[in-house]
């Protein structure tokens, strides 16, 4: 995990990947549990956002300006 973002009492992990099709890694699962993350967002170079797993969203790099919205 590259960044822990606290927003309105929520714990959000941010992971940046170069892969076109990111996967949920064991270290991401550990971070979700150990850091009690409400959500993990994976930033990638693709074009469409999608849900990878419960509480895990994959987000295009072009959507970074909207992360706080």
Ranges and model annotations:
Residues 1-69:
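A cross-kingdom feature that marks ATP-driven nucleic-acid transaction machinery
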